[in-house]
Design a protein with these regions (language model features):
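C-terminal helical cap
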Residues: 292, 300-307, 358-369
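Acidic/histidine-rich helix-loop elements
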Residues: 67-80, 103-124, 176, 197-216, ...
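Short acidic/histidine-rich active-site segments
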Residues: 296-297, 316-337
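Histidine/acidic residue-rich metal-binding segments in metalloenzymes
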Residues: 55, 82-84, 177-191, 209-256, ...
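N-terminal secretory signal peptides
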Residues: 1-17, 24, 40
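C-terminal segment of N-terminal export signals and the immediately downstream linker at the start
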Residues: 33-67
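Conserved, mostly hydrophobic/aromatic
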Residues: 66, 150, 189, 234, ...
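A metal-dependent hydrolase metal-coordination microenvironment
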Residues: 87-180, 208-212, 218-219, 225-226
Length: 374
C-alpha cells in the first residue's frame, strides 16, 4: 500500500476518500464521548449531523479567515511553535489565515484592553516582522503545513487533504511609508494584509485609537492600489468606519473585514469589545465591494455564535459572511481546530442549508481570494 491509495473490499480509495471516511467515524466517536466546543452542547449533535458537516467540508474549502493559532497570544514575542496542523486535520479545517502581528513588541494589555506601550523606533517593527516570517516558515515546515500562494494552491491542498495556511499580516505599521516593503513580504509568501491594528500609522485611523487622519490617508490609498496590483487580500478589520468608507471608494477588488461582530449583537451579549464591533452600515459597505465580514469567536456558546453569523447574514446576505475566529487572542468557542467540524454541524441545525454553511465556512473567502490573489 502506498501513500496515495489503498484497497478496501475490492475498491480503490484515494487518500482523500479514506481520510473523509475516517473523519466521519472519528467525529461521531467524539460526539458520543461528549467532546464539544467551549460553552456548547456539541455533544448533543448526532452522528447524522456530524456526517452532514463533514460532507460540507468535503465539498467546499473551509477557511478561518483570521487566526493566531500556532502562536502564543497577542503580546507574547515567543516563536510560533504549536502544532496547528494536528488540530486542522482532526477538525477537517482546510485553510487557516495565519496572522502575524508586526506591532506586537510595543503592545500591552490591561483592563482597558490592548494598548500601545510606546512609539516604535524606525525600522523596529519591520525587522521584527521579517524575523517572525522566518519563524512561521520554520513552524509550517516542521508540522507539514502547506503554504498557499494562489487559489490553485488552496484547491490542491484541499483535494489532497493537506492543511494549508495563507500568510497574513495584521497591521502594516512596518511599511513606514515604503511601498517596496509590501512587495518584499509578498515575495516572502504573504497573501493577506490588514491595513491597521492597534498602533497609529500613516495609512488610516483604527477603531480603538484617537482619530488623527479623519479616515484613509493618501498613502493608505496607494497601499490599497498596491495590494490589488501585487495580489493581496486587503483586510480592513480594526479600521474606523470612515476609513473603511474611504477605502471602498479606492478599492477595485473585494475587501475583507476579517474579525468583528455586529454592534449591539444580542447573540454576543454584553462585551468589553464594543469598540471593535461594527454598525450595519459599516458591514454593508464591505458587502458592496463583493467582500465579506468575518465573525470572531468571542461568544458565550456555539449556538450563540451561529446566531451571530445569522445576525450578520440578515444584514449583508449569505454571500458576504465568513468565519474569522481571532483564535489564541482571548478565550472563545473554537479553542482548537479539532472542534471545527462541530461549528459547521451547528450551522446545519436549523439556521443554514448545507450550501449556505459551505459559503460561510470558506466559500465566500475563496471567492475573494480568487479575485484578489488569483
Amino acid at each position: 500500500m502506498d501513500c496515495c491509495s489503498m484497497h478496501c473490499h475490492g475498491h480503490l480509495f484515494t487518500r482523500r476518500q479514506w481520510m473523509w471516511s475516517t473523519a466521519v467515524a472519528s467525529v461521531a466517536a467524539m460526539l458520543g464521548g461528549g467532546v464539544g466546543l467551549h460553552g456548547s452542547t456539541a455533544a448533543a449533535q448526532t452522528a447524522e449531523t456530524a456526517s452532514a458537516a463533514l460532507e460540507v467540508l468535503r465539498n467546499s474549502i473551509s477557511v478561518d479567515v483570521h487566526t493566531h493559532g500556532g502562536t502564543t497570544g497577542i503580546t507574547s514575542q515567543a516563536p510560533p511553535n504549536d502544532d496547528l496542523a494536528k488540530g486542522m486535520r482532526a477538525g477537517s479545517l482546510a485553510i487557516a489565515c495565519l496572522a502575524d502581528v508586526p506591532d506586537r513588541p510595543i503592545l500591552k494589555t490591561n483592563e482597558a484592553g490592548v494598548l500601545t506601550a510606546g512609539t516604535p523606533q524606525p525600522g523596529q517593527l519591520y525587522k521584527y516582522h521579517l524575523n517572525r516570517l522566518d519563524w512561521v516558515d520554520e513552524m509550517t515546515a516542521h508540522h507539514g503545513l502547506r503554504r498557499a500562494l494562489s487559489a490553485a494552491d488552496l484547491e490542491a491542498a484541499h483535494a489532497a487533504g493537506d492543511p494549508a495556511i495563507v500568510g497574513d499580516v495584521e497591521g502594516l505599521d512596518f511599511l513606514e511609508g515604503k511601498l517596496e516593503r509590501l512587495e518584499e513580504v509578498h515575495q516572502r509568501g504573504v497573501r493577506h494584509v490588514q491595513l491597521v491594528h492597534y498602533t497609529p500609522n500613516d495609512i488610516g485611523d483604527f477603531q480603538t485609537g484617537t482619530v488623527t487622519h479623519q479616515g484613509l490617508t493618501s498613502f493608505g490609498a496607494e497601499v490599497i492600489r498596491a495590494c490589488h496590483r501585487l495580489g493581496f487580500v486587503c483586510d480592513v478589520a480594526h479600521a474606523t468606519e470612515d476609513t473603511v468608507k474611504a477605502a471602498v471608494k479606492v478599492a477595485t477588488k473585494p475587501l475583507l473585514l476579517s474579525h468583528t461582530a455586529l454592534s449591539g449583537s444580542p447573540a454576543m451579549g454584553p462585551t468589553p469589545l464594543t469598540g471593535r464591533q461594527i454598525s450595519r452600515e459599516h458591514a454593508r459597505v464591505i458587502a458592496e465591494t463583493g467582500g465579506a465580514v468575518g465573525i470572531w469567536h468571542f461568544f458565550p456558546s456555539i449556538e450563540r455564535y451561529v446566531d451571530g453569523l445569522k445576525e450578520m447574514v440578515d444584514v449583508v446576505g449569505i454571500d458576504h459572511v465568513c468565519v474569522g475566529t481571532d483564535q489564541q487572542v482571548n478565550p472563545g468557542i473554537v479553542q482548537d481546530y479539532s472542534k471545527w467540524v462541530h461549528l459547521v454541524g451547528e450551522m446545519l441545525t436549523g439556521r443554514f442549508t448545507p450550501d449556505e454553511a459551505g459559503k460561510i465556512a470558506g466559500g465566500n473567502y475563496m471567492r475573494i481570494f480568487r479575485t484578489a490573489v488569483g
